[in-house]
Structures are given as structure tokens and as C-alpha cells.
Amino acid sequence: MTHTTRASLRDSAIGRKRTRIKRLEIFLSLLPVVLILLVFRVYPIVTALAKSFTNWDGLYRSDWVGLRNYVTFVQEGTFWMILRNTLILLLNVPLQVFIGIVVALLLYERVAGWRIYRAVIYTPQIISAVIIGFLFKIFFGFEGPFNAVLKAVGLGTLAIEWFGNSYTALGVIVFSIVWFSIGWQAIVILGGMSSIPPSVFEAAVIDGANYWQRAFRIVIPMLVRVLEFSIIASGVWTLTQLFPFLFAMTKGGPGYETSTLDYMIYLKSYGLGFGRDYGTATAVAMILLLLVLALTVIEMRLANRADDWG
Amino acid sequence: MKRLFTFSLLLVFLLASVAITLSSCGGKKEAVKLTVWMNGADSIIGPTEQQKPQDQWYVSQAFRRFEKANPGVTLELVVQADQGAAHTNFKTAGLAGNAPDVANLWTGQPIFALKEVILSLDKLVPADDLKYIVGWESVRDGFKPDGTILGYPAAQNQICHMLYNKAIVKKAGMDWEANPPRTIEEFDSALAKIKAIGVTPIVVDEAAQGVPWFFCWVADYWWTQMTTNDGILEETYGRKKFAEDKGFLATLAYYRSMYVKGFFRKDLTTANDSFTQFLNGKGALWPAVTSFLADAEKSLGADCGVLLPPEFDPNAKLVNSTVGGPGQSFVVAKNTKYPQMAVKLISFLNSKAEVLAAQKINRYPIVRTDVTPEEMGWVPGSNIAKLHKYSTTYNYWVDNLLTSGPAEIFYTQTSLVAVGKMTPLQLAEAMDKKAAAQ
């Protein structure tokens, strides 16, 4: 064996050892996060998935019932209404993103009084969602201020029972969510805009680009990843975090006319009825999980395509 | 001398040790602490009591009396603001083995559904309590006369009725104290007269709190008049059909007709301020249980009257009655370490002396048969005395008969029938579907 060969073997042994050490480092670095994910994410999801195939009552009864919970829930007659409500409420996402961009651009360009606007626009975020829900319930109540104003200006025919009809009630809920969220959207987008060199905006202004052209030709194309984050975050939030708004404003009613999938999880688990149908509640949670995953994948693919165009 | 001194010292030390040991063994009793969950409304905590400091509440004072009578026992009061959630919380705590020793829950199906975590009281209830307290059927498993006793009926008896504003009724040309409407036709005609003077006849929040209050407190009486509680139980267990229950369908149809005729406030499915409106004279009637009487009398004074539901079918077996009874119970958790003491506490709260003491703070028709209205200090002909007449002739809560599936539909969708978004038959069929799936 030549000296070169020996040296080469030694080097390769050292290389393998280094690779092993590197792998061990990676493994040990990831281990805490993986363990946390396994315990706090994977285990509950797998348990919920398993429970969704049982008649679990939250206590001792947990017999295998196959797909019965899913089939019964879908066949209940209210499923499609609940799914429709859930999807209608997602309309708040494009609305809040659009208004968020408009507001962020105004703040970025430091219009007169921008400091006050920045503080005011974020205020709803620090108010409890339950309080916001109650405020909107009172404001849009049949005998509330909104209808009083309509009547005062001679539009009494428009003074309807806003929460008495599925579509108008959902419209009010969407409005309240947008009102609540535009501050957050504006701050997120404003944060993204700080990564765009000011010279780009200055050049656009010199070239005669107006406000809307700057919004649609500069901000949106250059902030695809930020918008992707805000759309996914808002979408997931809409699908899973609307409970306090619904509870305060409509309690999912009248009937199930403003109930959503996440509200149904509550109703099946804790609603009046005393049976505590946790089996069905977990089945609804699984359906919601699938919906969240599907919408996230679709949105990410669209964002990737948009980024490619950019 | 030295030996004697040493011996004496040892003897004193020995005697002192024995004395200390004996005193620590025999003199000190084991400390007993009971945790008690109490509903914050419609319970022995009255609605107006909560405006006072907690130590001035009747229940706090009763607890101090019990502690004084039972040295070594301490009671911890935990108020449950959300009664519906209290059931789930109790169940969850029971599963974990740390449920409160005593809990104030609803009678009927709500506690039947929790029997895995509730202690059977069959061998613990004193004979006198069984003799003098009414409403045991509401806490016996399955409503069977020999069913396991899952709890005590709570000390107050809730009698369903309608509170009404005498001034408005008088303005409409009627006097319900002398001549109350007793049939559906008379009731219809009376409500029409109230509407004619520009006042909403009945103000009610029929869905805002997830319960159709008018139906549960008034119309349920009409339903059970025609179907009977046994018939409703057959339906909820899936042995008969709600959709074939003529009494149920007729009651729902009348309920719908009341809305069409403008007898209810227009926004009854979304309103949540009806009691305030009633107290402010914006409505003539408000469906109620006894716990609201004190507040109404305080606001309306002599203009506050009570009206019992008219008879839907004057030829029915059940007449001159109303829905009610002890809607609340006291149960003992299976995991309690002190079952005897827990039952002793509940028995104490239901005792004649405590019932009389409670009446000084809250006024309720009671569940004891050995207390007269005179002992309670009720003026003959007063609203409370009128309601007390039904203390032993009430018809047990219909909605508490419903099992979870049909109950879910009943609570969430009955108001939709009133506003015409659902037909009576559709509601009944939906309840049947749930009953069949149980």
C-alpha cells in the first residue's frame, strides 16, 4: 500500500467520522423539537383520529364504530350549510389582505397623521374578541344603533334583523373580522415592505406611477411570500379561531345558520344536549383538519406560481 | 437522693409523653373539607343576591351554620357561571377523580348522562327526606319509581308561568286577576287586544341563550297535556315517533301562528334583552320561572302579575297544572372521600329550618310538604302564594326528559319553527332521526 493510498484511507475515515458526528449533531439538535412535536402535535392528532372512529363520550365509553360519526354528520342535513358557512366566512381573507395592503401603503408613504392612524388601526387587535362580538351584536341588533341610523336617514326598509338571516348574519361576522384584522394585516405587510428598497418606490413615483399602480405593480409582486404567510395565517385563523366571535354574536344560530365546523366541535362536545358526543366532535375536527390542509396546499401552490411569475 | 430525682424526672417525662400522645390521638378529629359547586343562577343563589358580597349570600350563611354544627368540617363554595358547561366540567373532573364532593346540576337526563361519575344515594338518603321532600322522580335514574337515586332535588321549586304587566293588560281592557284567559281561544283573543293598543304582547329571547324559553316554559305544558311525559319519553328513546305525535305538531303549529299574528317580538330568534324590555313596560308578558319573580316585583311593583299557561286541551288528563318542579339537583361525586358528610350537607340545605331561613332572602315555591305558606310568611293571594299552589301538582320539565340527540335539535331549532324557517313536521322528523341514531 502506497503512502498516498494510506493517507487517502485515513482522510476518508476521518471524513466518515466527521459525517457521523455531523449527523449526530443534527439528530441531537432536532431531537427536542421532534419530541415536542410528537408529544404536543402528532400524539393529539393521532389520538383524535382514532377517537373519531369511536362513540367516545369523554369518559369510559369508546367503542369502535367505523365511519359512522363521519357518515352521520354528513347526512345530518346541516353539514352542507355548516360547510357553506365556513367557506363564506373565508371571504374575509381577501378583504382583509386587500385593505391591509392599502393601509400599509398609506402608512409606508407617511401620509399626514400616519402615526395616529398606525396606532388606531391596530387598536381592535388588543380588544378581546368576545367584547368585539358583543359590540357588533348590539350595533347590528334589530333595535340597535345601525338600524336606528338607517331609520333616521329614511332608509327604514333596510333596517332588517341582521342576525336573523344566514347571509346577512355571516356578512356582519365577516365585517367584524375584517375590522378586527386589518391592523394586523397592515403591520405584517408593512414589515414586508421594509425589505423593499425605498429607491424602488422613489423611482416609481418619478416615473409617474400612481397609488394603485404602486400597490399592484410593486407591493404585491415583491411581497408574494409575505402575502402567502398572511393569507395562510388568516385562512387557518378563520377556520379555527372564530369561536369567540360566533359565541358572542350568534351562538351559531338561529338554528345552525351561522355555525361553522369549529363551532360544531364545541356544540358536539359542550353544547346543550348533555350527551357529549366527543366521537362526532373529533370526526368534525378531522374534517376541519383536512380542509385546512387542502386550502393551505392550494394556496401555497398558487403562491409558488405567482413567485415564479415575479 | 440523686437516684430519686432522676427517677422522678424520668417518670414526669414518661407521663408527659403519654399524655401528649393520647391527646393527639383522641382529641383531634380528622379535618373534613367538602368542595361544593353551585350554579350562579336559578339555584339557591338568587339573581339579586349576586349584587351583594358573597358572605352575605344565603348559601354562604347556611354553610357557616353547617360548619358550626359540624366542627372540623369546612365547606368551599365554587360558583359555576355557566350551568350547561358545569355538567361537562363535572364529568371531566369526575374522570380525573377530582370532581367536587357535591355539585348542583340539572335534574333528569342531564344527570342520568353523568351517572358514571355520580354516587348512588340509595343507601344514604334519610327516610324522613324521602317522606317530606317532593320531586324524587326527577333524580331517579330513568324517571323510574325504583330507579337509583342520583341526587337530591334542590331546595327550590321552579314553577313555569308568565309574568305580566297589569297596567298594560288593564289598558287593553282586561283584568286577569279576576278573569285570566284559561283556554287557547281566550288567550289568543287577549293577546290580540294587547297588540291592538300598540304593545308587543310577549317579549322573549327564544334562541339567544340556546334555549327556546317560551316553548320550554309555556308551550311544553300544552305538548305534555296531549302527549304526556311517558309518551315523550317513548319518543326520545326512539320507540315512538315525534313526527307522529299530534300533540307536539299541534303545539308547534300554534306556536308558529302566534308569531304570524304578531304576538311575539319580531326578532325573537336573535333578541337578548327581553326581560329588560318587559321590566321597562315594552312588552306585556314574559315567560318565566320563579327565580325571576322577585326582580319583576321590585321593578313593576303592584303591576307585576303571574299568569299560568291556559289549557290547550280542556279535556286532557292533565289540566290545572304547569311545567316545573325541581329543575336543579344536588349530586355527590363518586370520588368523594366523605359521602356521608356530603349527604348530610345536602339534607341540611333541604331541611325545614334551612328552607325557612332561605325564604328570608330568596322566595321560591319549595319542595317540602311539611311547610305551609303561612310559615313561609306569604300573603294569601300574592304572586308567590299563587305559584306555590303548583308545588306538588306541577308536570315535570319536558325538556329534561329529552335525551341528548333529540334535545340538541329541540334546543337549537325549535325557534326556527316560530319564524317559519322550518315546519313542525321537519323539526319532529329531525328529532326522530337523532333519536334513532342514539
Model-derived features: where do they sit?
Chain B
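Extracytoplasmic/periplasmic substrate-recognition and gating elements
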Residues: K261, K298-R363
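Conserved C-terminal helix/tail region of periplasmic/extracytoplasmic solute-binding proteins
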Residues: T74, V78, K170, V355, ...
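A structural signal for short loop-to-beta-strand junctions that line the ligand-binding cleft
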Residues: D101, L130-V169, A316-V323, T393-N400
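Short, solvent-exposed loop/beta-turn-alpha elements that line the ligand-binding surface or hinge
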Residues: D122-G135, N179-P180, I202, W223-A250, ...
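Extracytoplasmic/periplasmic solute-binding protein
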Residues: K144-A155, C160, E185-G238, G283
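Glycine-centered hinge/linker elements that transmit conformational signals in sensory
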Residues: D188-K193, E234-L268
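Conserved N-terminal structural module of periplasmic/extracytoplasmic solute-binding proteins
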Residues: A19-I111, K115, D129, W176-E177, ...
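Hinge/lid segment of periplasmic solute-binding proteins
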Residues: A81, W106-C160, F215-C216, G305-L308
